[in-house]
Amino acid sequence: MSARKLQVEIEKTFKKVTDGIAIFDEVYEKLSASNSVSQKEKLEGDLKTQIKKLQRLRDQIKTWASSNDIKDKKALLENRRLIEAKMEEFKAVEREMKIKAFSKEGLSIASKLDPKEKEKQDTIQWISNAVEELERQAELIEAEAESLKATFKRGKKDLSKLSHLSELESRIERHKWHQDKLELIMRRLENSQISPEAVNDIQEDIMYYVECSQSEDFAEDENLYDELNLDEASASYDAERSGRSSSSSHSPSPSASSSSSSENLLQDKAEAEEKVSADASVQDIAEKESLDADKELATNDQEDDEEENQAETQKDGAISNNENMQSEVQTTNPSASTSAVTNITKPTLIQNPSTPLSVSNSKVASPETPNATHTAPKVEMRYASAAAAAAAALAKESPSHHYIMQQVRPETPNSPRLNSTVIQSKWDSLGHTASPKMQTQPVRSVSQSSATTETNVKPTKEENADVPVSSPDYLKDLVNALNTSKEQHKGAIDKEKLTEALNISCVYVPDATDAAKPQYYIPKDPYPVPHYYPQQPLPLFDSSEMTELVDPDTLFYMFYYRPGTYQQYIAGQELKKQSWRFHKKYTTWFQRHEEPKMITDEFESGSYRYFDFEGDWVQRKKADFRFTYQYLEDDDDWTR
């Protein structure tokens, strides 16, 4: 008996829910069609009253759904879902009513949509509703399947229950398949890859499946989505996604790149060690041969013309050897080669400080004694290789020094004398003016030039310490540059005087205000007054704080009788803060007397106050006035 009473109570509640939803829909339609603000507020109150009744019924339904006395809870869940849907609609109405009609957001909402865009949005909306309905049905079927599984007994199989369970599972899979298709249609609609008309053509078939798929005599259309070619779209989407994943898999990993970089570093280090060892061996050989060349300097007094011709022939051979060996030496480290050649030339300068540089290096290029004819090719070969290494490094570092090497010419007997100390001092001056990397290159250039040029040394008894050598053009240029730099340093300005002059010049640096011309006050109606009266207006009249303290009549006076001044600008800004708006057609300030009766995208109409500045200088009221937004002075300020 109690179960029957409970069932009657549930049916009464369902009837109340149906009636309440019908009343809610009726009030909602009236609210959507209304244009009056006051009427909308009244209808919103009616909606709120009705939704509260539905919420109480929803709480009762939730209580019954949670109890175990009722076996079939499908109707309870359905009515609860309907009430919750109406609650969501009421929330949307509340958000819309909170937006003011004359605000920016309100005007943007009221903007008209394109008909095609509106049709697309409507199509997306009903597809979304269909997906939600299928999701709800799938949840109910899953709940039924779970309850059916709970009735199975251990060790016993009921074939009828099993067949019913398999039927439920197939229906769930079919629902999910349709959900995927509908979601794909929505995605293609949003991307404008399919027209809304093509989707609306199959709307009836889709809604037939959504509403009648649970009936016994339902016949499903297997070719429902064939007209939309969704299989090709899904295949292209899957191919694009797989392409992105494959491209990401082909990218090298950080660990692989780091391992390859470490292997490259180890390989470079090994090559550098091999180059250093090779350069060291070349350096040792060059030092030994330079000592042998110094010992043979004593035999240079017995030279004749025949030996000079022989020296020319050997010089040509040394140059050819230099060219042949240059390709092999170029692979060595330039820095190591520089140090090696520097070490070759320095012992000669130290052992014989009074001997010219050309004397110490002449035998390197052309030994002239008959006893040294067998060892000369070896000496020239080794010195040529060292000189080629220096030339390769020098050509990489500085083209100017390569040009200096080419400027060296054979000396003549009538050339002026230049001892080694003078040459060393000039190279030192070159080192001071050059960069640190290039400081060792001049010495290297001298050794190379001495190895590739012909030198004829004929010392006499009177020339014990100084030997005539050629003065190349590049040395003359260096001497001139050195003298010029010394003269410039002598006439340099003292740092203290320079700082003092700079500070004095900064005192008169022009300011940003110097760019604008000063605007002096010129009275409109000048009248002679005593000097103790103010000759200019107070700065207070040009401040926005003053406009906040005066009444609107004063603001109107400042606006109309101070044209083109800053006072007119601040008066207009203050009037806008007080909800006054300027009409450009009538050149009059208007203010809303009440809420407008009608608001559109182009105008609004209602009762307004305006200031009569041409007549009686008073505020007047004008009813049923249409304010066109075209003549509004500032749309942003008006909608703020």
Curated annotation (Swiss-Prot):
Superkingdom as given in the UniProt entry: Eukaryota
PTM annotation (Phosphotyrosine): residues: Y474
Residues the record lists as Phosphothreonine modifications: T369, T433
Biased composition (Polar residues): 319-374, 436-458
The keyword Coiled coil belongs to this UniProt entry's keyword annotation: yes
Low complexity bias locations: 245-262
GO biological process: nuclear-transcribed mRNA poly(A) tail shortening; regulation of DNA-templated transcription
Pfam family membership, one: Not3
Biased composition (Acidic residues): 301-310
Chain positions with Phosphoserine modification: S248, S249, S251, S253, S366, S385, S435, S449, S471
Listed InterPro entries: CCR4-NOT_su2/3/5_C_sf, CCR4-NOT_su3/5, Not2/3/5, NOT2/3/5_C, Not_N
Biased composition (Basic and acidic residues): 266-277, 285-298
UniProt-annotated stretches for the region Disordered: 235-374, 432-471
GO cellular component: CCR4-NOT complex; CCR4-NOT core complex; cytosol; nucleus; P-body
Subcellular location: Cytoplasm; Nucleus
Coiled coil: 37-162, 287-331
Family per similarity comment: Belongs to the CNOT2/3/5 family.
Function: Acts as a component of the CCR4-NOT core complex, which in the nucleus seems to be a general transcription factor, and in the cytoplasm the major mRNA deadenylase involved in mRNA turnover. The NOT protein subcomplex negatively regulates the basal and activated transcription of many genes. Preferentially affects TC-type TATA element-dependent transcription. Could directly or indirectly inhibit component(s) of the general transcription machinery.
Protein name per its UniProtKB record: General negative regulator of transcription subunit 3
UniProt source species: Schizosaccharomyces pombe (strain 972 / ATCC 24843) (Fission yeast)
Lineage: Eukaryota, Fungi, Dikarya, Ascomycota, Taphrinomycotina
Gene that produces this protein: not3
